[in-house]
Amino acid sequence: SVPVIAVGRINDPELAEKILQEGKADLVSMGRALIADPQLPLKTIEGRLEEIRKCVACDYGCISRLFAGLRITCNINPDVGKEKEYKITRGEKVKNVIVAGGGLAGMESARVAALRGHNVTLYEKTGELGGQFVLATKPPHKEELQNVLDYLRVQMDKLGIRIELGREVSAKLVEEHKPDAVIVATGAVPLVPNIPSIEDKRVVTAWDVLAGAASVK
């Protein structure tokens, strides 16, 4: 018989195993999944499935750039293509670091700082981590983006990063704690044009709709 290799959107080792166990293929090939997390096979062997950074098939950094003749990147793995430059090493001195903002940039910054051996406290002014990326998971068929948030939240816990929800970083807070470094990752706000009737109650932003604060019928 001819060996069959299954390929395409297989980003979960449990799905890969299911394909093999059910006899649907002899081998499973992963491409983008290993760009997003090169350690996926090792984490699977060690039973650390919750630590896998799963590809979300955005294709923005890999396939789209490859077809354009550009160096590939990855939206959820900033190391791709710059592994040498971004090599994470232990700092010479342990520092106290404050991260302002609990979105993707804030959590990734906190993760790297902790891996370098620093004491990290992350402040998020809302009641949950994720920032505006939480809204990105709300539209239909975008639920898989939740994998990115799940991965980073697991990392926050695994690395012992102190999380302060419902607290905003201020000059007073920084003065009180006197950290060695402050990382500002407070995100962006919608650019609302200054045009007539913009304050009308019928005018809403995408942020409001996705957050459930406004409805469009």
Task: Please identify what each model-predicted range represents.
Residues 1-100, 104-120, 128, 190-191, ...:
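Flavin-dependent oxidoreductase catalytic cores
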